[in-house]
């Protein structure tokens, strides 16, 4: 028999954890000043006035390295529990993990051929 009162704590937690942030945003919106002075509209760089043009564009060269790192970091997170329970899971899960690693290796080869791993 399915009893709904077993989930009362869950629903109370869900409602309270949803209402508190909404109330915080509403109250801060009511109490915050609406006029924006020149200090609010100026650029801010480490507590000092910016020298020159504050909207200078620059290229980030290592973002592809960071993306490839994140992909393989997530791979490690997925494969670690699998490696710990390898003897229990069986051959079918081993084949699934090999397919997962193969897809990631194909992604690495693609990134390598596109030049994502070159620092230029």
Swiss-Prot record:
Gene3D superfamilies, per the entry: NADH:ubiquinone/plastoquinone oxidoreductase, chain 3
Record-linked InterPro entries: NAD(P)H_OxRDtase_bac/plastid, NADH_UbQ/plastoQ_OxRdtase_su3, NDAH_ubi_oxred_su3_sf
Ranges that cross the membrane: 2-22, 64-84, 88-108
Membrane topology designation: Multi-pass membrane protein
Catalysed reactions, as listed in the record: a plastoquinone + NADH + (n+1) H(+)(in) = a plastoquinol + NAD(+) + n H(+)(out); a plastoquinone + NADPH + (n+1) H(+)(in) = a plastoquinol + NADP(+) + n H(+)(out)
Keywords: Chloroplast, Membrane, NAD, NADP, Plastid, Plastoquinone, Quinone, Thylakoid, Translocase, Transmembrane, Transmembrane helix, Transport
One function term, GO molecular function aspect: NADH dehydrogenase (ubiquinone) activity
EC number(s) stated in the UniProt entry for this protein: 7.1.1.-
Function: NDH shuttles electrons from NAD(P)H:plastoquinone, via FMN and iron-sulfur (Fe-S) centers, to quinones in the photosynthetic chain and possibly in a chloroplast respiratory chain. The immediate electron acceptor for the enzyme in this species is believed to be plastoquinone. Couples the redox reaction to proton translocation, and thus conserves the redox energy in a proton gradient.
Family to which the UniProt record says this protein belongs: Belongs to the complex I subunit 3 family.
Annotated protein name in UniProt: NAD(P)H-quinone oxidoreductase subunit 3, chloroplastic
Species: Oenothera argillicola (Appalachian evening primrose)
């Amino acid at each position: 028999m399915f009893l709904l009162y077993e989930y009362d704590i869950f629903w109370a937690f869900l409602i309270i954890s949803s209402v508190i942030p909404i109330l915080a945003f509403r109250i801060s919106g009511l109490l915050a000043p609406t006029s924006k002075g020149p200090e609010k509209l100026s650029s801010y760089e480490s507590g000092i006035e910016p020298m020159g043009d504050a909207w200078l564009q620059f290229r980030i060269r290592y973002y592809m390295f960071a993306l490839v790192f994140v992909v393989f970091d997530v791979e490690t997170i997925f494969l670690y529990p699998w490696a710990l329970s390898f003897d229990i899971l069986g051959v079918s899960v081993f084949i699934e993990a090999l397919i997962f690693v193969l897809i990631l290796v194909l992604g690495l080869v693609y990134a390598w051929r596109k030049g994502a791993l070159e620092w230029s």
